[in-house]
């Protein structure tokens, strides 16, 4: 009888965590997710999984070592996927101490918990690292041997997490791996991230619910992939014979401007760009008559970071060769369309619900319904 695979996922309520939970459940795993206690219900992405016999949730926090030790001791996982993080680069400038506690020391708390409960030789650990480590890049594209030059408090914290994983692998022989994730998006992406901000704005503008989209540096270059494809690579990393670190990327690069151009195209709006830098604007040249000639995208200095990483481009050669992973399962164009289609439906649904509420309020005021 084969041993039951037991996965513990931190950050299970996030974009990656929810997709990874689905993948592992489909592979027959017992999946245990770690969630934080909160007065706000943030479990929308995993609501469809709750109630399944092999899906379990536990309360713990990366800032609380005792809670982490308790969960690891109770679950006794064969694999841990540490996806929890303060993952907003901009927020890390506003909350650097919190970012360091979660993204740096939080990683240490997890691997120490594994050692303390006696699972160092039986539990494999995946750490979600980031392309932001490359920061002020010294070469393109970036691979596993490219020097790091972190350019934000978030990246600095993540660099500690990266190196402590390598240290425990070397010092204690633990199966610990870093996945250096380049930007990966989906219809489950948080609405404050630039890609989701763009697709939601395009949908709202197309449906008459928003006038304009404000963005930061349109020239920023990113390697964008589909999160659903990337979680497969996370799993493959822990199935390898030896623990190693891998770049997870598509190997294809696009600008923020290109992402916006394509998103608006998919809602039936064509943009023409005029001006440069902070004075650049996206003007509608084709689409609904009431929008033609209007400026729909503007650059705002408010969205520029104190230090900005402008050229991230990953080389997934190692993951492709050693793991057999296909980084181009979903193309850039397909990714943007998936997100736009989802947000067009979401905005339409929200608009319909708002109309019902307005009509009900009007009927109540007139005494039509009581």
Predicted regions located by residue number:
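N-terminal Rossmann-like NAD(P)+-binding domain of SDR-like oxidoreductases, especially those catalyzing
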Residues: 1-184, 228, 234, 238, ...
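C-terminal substrate-binding subdomain of Rossmann-fold SDR/epimerase-dehydratase oxidoreductases
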Residues: 26, 33-34, 60, 189-370
């Amino acid at each position: 009888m084969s041993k039951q695979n037991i996965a513990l996922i931190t950050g299970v309520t996030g974009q990656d965590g929810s997709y990874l939970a689905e993948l592992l459940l489909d592979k027959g795993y017992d999946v245990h997710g770690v969630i934080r206690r909160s007065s706000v219900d943030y479990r929308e992405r995993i609501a469809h999984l709750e109630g399944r016999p092999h899906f379990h949730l536990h309360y713990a926090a990366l800032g609380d070592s005792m809670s982490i030790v308790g969960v690891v001791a109770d679950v006794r996982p064969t694999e841990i996927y540490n996806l929890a993080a303060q993952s907003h680069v901009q927020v890390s400038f506003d909350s650097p101490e919190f970012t360091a506690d979660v993204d740096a020391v939080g990683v240490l708390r997890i691997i120490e918990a594994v050692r303390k409960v006696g699972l160092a030789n039986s539990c494999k650990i995946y750490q979600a690292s980031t392309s932001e480590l490359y920061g002020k890049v010294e070469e393109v594209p970036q691979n596993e041997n490219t020097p790091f030059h972190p350019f934000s408090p978030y990246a600095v914290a993540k660099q500690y997490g990266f190196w402590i994983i390598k240290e425990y692998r070397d010092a204690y022989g633990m199966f610990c791996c870093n996945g250096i994730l380049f930007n990966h998006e989906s219809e489950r992406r948080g609405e404050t991230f630039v890609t989701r901000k763009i697709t939601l704005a395009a949908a709202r503008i197309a449906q008459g619910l928003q006038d304009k989209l404000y963005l930061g540096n349109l020239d920023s270059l990113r390697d964008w992939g589909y999160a659903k494809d990337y979680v497969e690579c996370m799993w493959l990393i822990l199935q390898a014979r030896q623990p190693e670190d891998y770049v997870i990327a598509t190997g294809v690069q696009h600008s923020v401007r290109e992402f916006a151009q394509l998103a608006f195209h998919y809602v039936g709006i064509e943009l023409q760009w005029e001006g440069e830098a902070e004075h650049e604007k996206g003007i509608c040249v084709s689409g609904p008559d009431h929008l033609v000639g209007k400026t729909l995208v503007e650059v705002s200095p408010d969205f520029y970071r104190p230090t900005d990483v402008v050229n991230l481009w990953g080389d997934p050669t190692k993951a492709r060769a050693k793991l057999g992973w296909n980084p181009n399962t979903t193309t850039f164009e397909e990714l943007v369309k998936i997100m736009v289609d989802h947000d067009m439906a979401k905005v339409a649904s929200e608009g319909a619900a708002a109309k019902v509420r307005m009509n009900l309020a009007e009927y109540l005021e007139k005494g039509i319904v009581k």
